[in-house]
Every structure is written in C-alpha cells, then in structure tokens.
Amino acid sequence: PEERGVLPLDTFNVPRGLARAMKKHDYVVTIDTAFEGVIRACGTLTKERKETWINEQLVQLYTALFHAGHAHSIEVWSTKNELVGGLYGVSLGGAFFGESMFSRAPDASKIALVHLVEVLRGAGYILLDTQYVNEHLKQFGVEAWSKRRYMTKLEKALSASPNPSTRFSTASVRSGVASSSSVKRI
C-alpha cells in the first residue's frame, strides 16, 4: 500500500480519559498466556463485526508462529478470570506487526495496547505497525506513513535485536500497575 499505519513508540499518547479509567479498572494483564484464545476472540463475529478474515487455517498458522516465538499476545482478564480483551501480532527483529484486537469490556483492548507499547519500548523495539489508521487508533498517535518512510524504518527494525531479557516476558500486571520492569505504570 502507498500508506501504512504506524504508532511511533516515542510519541505514544495515552488519552487522559483512558489514563483515569486504567486506575479504576481492576483488570489483570498477561503476556503470551492465552494466545489462541485471543486470536479466536478477535475472529468472533459480533453485532458490530459481521465478517472476519480470521479463519481456522489462520488460527493454526498464527498459533504455529506463536509456538516458534514469532507471534505474541497481550491478554486482559476480569476479576472473574474471564478474557475480556486483548491483541496479538507478529514480532520480527525490532518490528511488531499488530494483527487484531478485541474488547468485551470497557477499555480492555485499549489497556492491552498501552501494555504492548510499554513492552516494546522496554525491549528496544523500533517499529509498531498497525497496518492502517482509524479513529480508534488515532487517539493514541497512530500516523499514516508514506511507503518510502515506512520501508526505511522497517529495514532498520528488521535488522535490530531487541533486548531478549525484556521481550515479551510472561508478566502479570494489574491494569495500570506493573509487577515487571518491562511493563510500567502509565
């Protein structure tokens, strides 16, 4: 495509309302503990989502990437231990390609995104590719990058080596409160 959605990690914006909401919600955020559950939830049809590109073959392929260490998920859980939000994507070098996200509770997918950015920042990632720009993502600072600008950054990101000790640790955190150095309070 001529333009690509990118969330610049150094200028990531947490909307004020979300920052307040994160202090109120009592969600637990985990990393890489329910990958298949997240991808299946992202592919579930709802009133708002009448069709999906996530079919069984893609679930199996992305799950294989997960087991190989190339795909990751951020999960958001309710106090009743229900998966209420999350996202998943593919990690190559210092680039993370966000594939899809879902929310079954207020702010759950947004909280997952905030934690993803903190993990990526802490590990030294260079690029967070969101594929496209929409109103939901704009509030966080997602920008439409030209193909040339994107390819230049992608080349650098693919040759980068993020810090393996902070890459997608299986930290468990309360919404907005960290229990791991790779995920910080926002």
Regions found by a protein language model. Give the residues of each.
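N-acyltransferase acceptor-side catalytic subdomain
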Residues: 1-186
